[in-house]
C-alpha cells in the first residue's frame, strides 16, 4: 500500500497555493496598517510552556497535544496554538525592554489531536496577533476592529456575529467560581468524567466542555458578568464604548470562556453559521505565569482553513494569478536554444515565460500553452531564426503581431 498523508493533514497543491497567498497578503496588509510586525516562532516548544501557559486542565493539554521525548530526554510538544510561543519569545528576547506596546502577527501551523470537523484538521494553520504592554480597553477594541474589517471588508464575508464577554480578573473570577460550583453541585453526577475533575480545580472550564450533557447543564449557569469587580466592569464598558464609536456591532455572550486558561477580562469569538471563525482575548497574567515581568496582553487566532472554507461556501472568488504570460514554442534543437535564451531574458524583464521541455510537436506545445492559460504564444523554427522575425499571437482574440527576435520588441508587445 502506498504511503499516504496522515489522517487530519492535507497537502497544499499548486492549484490551491494562490488562495493561501491571497489571504496571507490581505492579512499582512491590514496588519501593517495597524503597525503590527511579523514574528516567527519554532514549530515545537518545551511541553512545560503549554502546561503552564495554556493550562493543565484544558482539553488542549489533557487530550490534544502531540508530545514526545527527544533524544536528549526532553519533553517536546508541537505547538497547539500560537500565543504561548509568542509570549516565550517576548520574554526570552527581552522585547519588554522596547517601547511599548509590542505588536506582532504570525502565520503558523498548529497541531492538535482532536476529532476532525468542518474546517478543522489535526494540522491546521493560524493567523494570529499578539499585543503586549497595554491594559487599556482601547487596544482590545483596535484588534477587534482589525478582525471585523479584515473579514467583512477585505474578504467580503457576510452574516458574521462578533460575540464578546469579560472573564474579569482573578479576584472577581474566584467569586464567580464559587457561585458556579454551587450551581453545578446538584448536577455533579451528570457531568462527564473530565468535568468532574475540573469541578474543584477549574470549574469555569466546564462551561467550555463540548460534551452534549455538560452543554445542557451549563445553559442556565450563573453569568460571570454578574460577578466582575468595578475595575473589570469599567474596562468592559470602555470596550463597548470604543466599539460603538467605530460602528462595530457586537453581541454580549456570557458563556464565552474560550478553551485556554490564560484569558482574563475581554474574550471574543466571531461566529459564522454556528462555527467559530476566530477567537481570542486578553491575557494579562500569562507573561508573568511563564516567568516574565508583569505585562498585560491581548491577542487572537484565525483559522486559515476555516476562512478558506467560508470564502468557498459564500461563493467569494479568489482571483487566480496569470501562470504564463508568454509560451515560446520551438521546432528543432537550434530553435530550442533560441527559445531558451528568449525565455531567460523575458523572465529577467519580469515576464512569466515557458518553453517546451518534453520534445513535443508544435501542435502539442500550443495545446499545452492553451491549457496553462498563456496570454501570448509564438513558435520559433529555422525560418524565424534566418529571417529574425516571429509572429506573436494574443490568445484572447487571436490577433498576431510581427516583430523581430529582439527582446525589447517582444517585451513591448507582451508587457
Swiss-Prot record:
Coarsely, its chief localization is cytoplasm
Where does it live in the cell?
Cytoplasm
Query: What GO terms fall under cellular component here?
Result: cytoplasm
Its Enzyme Commission number(s) read 6.1.1.21
Q: Which GO terms describe its molecular function?
A: ATP binding; catalytic activity, acting on a protein; histidine-tRNA ligase activity; transferase activity
GO biological process: any one? histidyl-tRNA aminoacylation
Q: Tell me the keywords, alphabetical order.
A: Aminoacyl-tRNA synthetase, ATP-binding, Cytoplasm, Ligase, Nucleotide-binding, Protein biosynthesis
Q: Which reaction does it catalyse?
A: tRNA(His) + L-histidine + ATP = L-histidyl-tRNA(His) + AMP + diphosphate + H(+)
InterPro entries (alphabetical): aa-tRNA-synth_II (IPR006195), aa-tRNA-synth_II/BPL/LPL (IPR045864), Anticodon-bd (IPR004154), Anticodon-bd_dom_sf (IPR036621), His-tRNA-ligase (IPR015807), HisRS-like_core (IPR041715), HisRS/HisZ (IPR004516), HisRS_anticodon (IPR033656)
PROSITE patterns attached to this UniProt entry: AA_TRNA_LIGASE_II
Which EC class is the enzyme in? ligase
Query: Coiled-coil regions in this chain?
Result: none
The record's comment on protein family reads: Belongs to the class-II aminoacyl-tRNA synthetase family.
Question: By its UniProt entry, which PANTHER family does this protein fall under?
Answer: HISTIDINE--TRNA LIGASE, MITOCHONDRIAL-RELATED (PTHR43707:SF1), HISTIDYL-TRNA SYNTHETASE (PTHR43707)
Q: How does it assemble?
A: Homodimer.
This chain's protein is named: Histidine--tRNA ligase
